[in-house]
Amino acid sequence: MASLDRVKVLVLGDSGVGKSSLVHLLCQNQVLGNPSWTVGCSVDVRLHEYREGTPEEKTYYIELWDVGGSVGSASSVKSTRAVFYNAVNGIILVHDLTNKKSSQNLYRWSLEALNRDLQPTGVLVTNGDYDREQFADNQIPLLVIGTKLDQIPEAKRSEVLTRTAFLAEDFNAEEINLDCTNTRCLAAGSSNAVKLSRFFDKVIEKRYSREGNLIPGFSDRKRFAGGNFKSLHYD
């Protein structure tokens, strides 16, 4: 296999929301049997067919960086975590549909990551106030994913999904709600799979295009040799 271009996507959210299970499902198409806490950052890779089924179809590596920790961590922890926010091409914000606090904390996660990207001085936001206009010029594609959909009682599902729809609107992002213990939730052709593919296409276009045309290469581009690959863990 020829070497492939890659993009870097952060996976952010509170501890316990199911980020590791989500990444495993996205990259291995399998349910993660024994999820554990992520210390530092764990990186897994997914193959993605850009514009699949069109003459522009091309295979890319999607690096998914599962960042551990709590949004309320001490400033020293945030400073350490900030190293993972460099050269980001996309962000997946993950929240637990059964935990409203994890949804609210996505605003703080986005501020932390985007401010690190927009302000290379390392200044991080410490309060939880979110102004939609604050990142109006943000060019990094976002996707909001709600986990543990299976744990939402049918009687409350409409209320919860309405709330998450407003959440995604705040980020000007599409939303996916799923059960990470069910591989069918991302089955080919499903609405979730279409949204996910559309998000990855957008990330690739932002990274490798100029005025809408894909560019052959960038001087800072990293390449991966074809063949087997495995997860990387940064502690």
UniProtKB/Swiss-Prot annotation:
Listed Gene3D superfamilies: P-loop containing nucleotide triphosphate hydrolases (3.40.50.300)
GO molecular function: GTP binding; protein homodimerization activity
Binding-site residues for GTP, renumbered to this chain: 16-21, 148-150, 179-180
Alphabetical keyword list: GTP-binding, Nucleotide-binding
Pfam name, any one: Roc
InterPro entries membership: P-loop_NTPase
SUPFAM superfamilies found in the cross-reference section: P-loop containing nucleoside triphosphate hydrolases
CDD domains: RabL3 (cd04102)
Biological processes, Gene Ontology terms: B cell differentiation; natural killer cell differentiation; regulation of protein lipidation; regulation of Ras protein signal transduction; T cell differentiation in thymus
UniProt-annotated stretches for the region Small GTPase-like: 1-235
Keyword Nucleotide-binding in annotation: yes
Assembly and binders: Homodimer.
Sequence similarity: Belongs to the small GTPase superfamily. Rab family.
Function: Required for KRAS signaling regulation and modulation of cell proliferation. Regulator of KRAS prenylation, and probably prenylation of other small GTPases. Required for lymphocyte development and function. Not required for myeloid cell development.
Name of protein: Rab-like protein 3
Species per Swiss-Prot/TrEMBL record: Xenopus tropicalis
Lineage: Eukaryota, Metazoa, Chordata, Craniata, Vertebrata
